[in-house]
Amino acid sequence: MGQCLSGNQVAGVANNGGEQPSGSNILRLPKLYTPNPLLTKEEVEVRRNEFWETCWAYGGSKEIWDVLHKVVTLLYEGNAEAATEMALAADLTIPENDISKGVYDSKGTFYEIPKIVARIPRAFAERKDSLDDEDDNMISSNDPTKSPEEHDTTTKSIASLKDAELDSSLETVLIRYSKDDKDYSIQINPNLPFSHAKSQLEEVGLENVQRFFFLGRVLQFKKSLSQQGWTSGMIIQAM
């Protein structure tokens, strides 16, 4: 993750005796974005917390990660000037003054902050709606007025959908192992539970890995990669 200001801009501020940066050098407030799929406010908060709790696993300095956490918090609060001053004090470089573009520390190490942390969702999913839908589906499936044939049709439709997911082609998943800083490639179906990747992990020598991280949170073996937000090209961290 990097600095908000260019080297010349940082030098200019220093030459002004530590005066506050001009308006053009102020960090931008978080932009809006549309998550896909939509998440509830609670889910967004959980993922953000998980990221800050595990961000050190992505490399870089823990001290810098702590500073970035404070900088992002200030930006959430609308205090761009204080966030900018903190970034300057830590000698960070932030491309285009946009924290979502990443940050570089004084040693040139890049720190990437995922959208869900660096930006603000344009909309949230409604937990109540999803629960109501589940209740409606349950009532419909238990409707005594439906004939066995109608129930069978519903069952077949669900089965067909599952078959389609299972038949989808395998995709390449890159896993970056923190112990040797190498990338390992496995071929798995992203629509199946991640636990199905056990044999592939053994083949590349990652059978002893205790935890896998993605977007700052621990991957769940009972869920598929697709369910956890993974798309082709994204890298999974292993520890």
From Swiss-Prot:
It comes from Schizosaccharomyces pombe (strain 972 / ATCC 24843). The keyword Hydrolase does not apply. Transmembrane segments: none annotated. This is Uncharacterized protein PB2B4.07. Residues 129-155 are annotated as: Disordered. InterPro entries: DC-UbP/UBTD2_N (IPR032752), DC-UbP/UBTD2_N_sf (IPR038169), Ubiquitin-like_domsf (IPR029071), UBTD1/2 (IPR039869). The lineage of its organism: Eukaryota, Fungi, Dikarya, Ascomycota, Taphrinomycotina. Keywords: Phosphoprotein. The keyword Phosphoprotein applies. It comes from the Eukaryota. The modification Phosphoserine is found at S160.
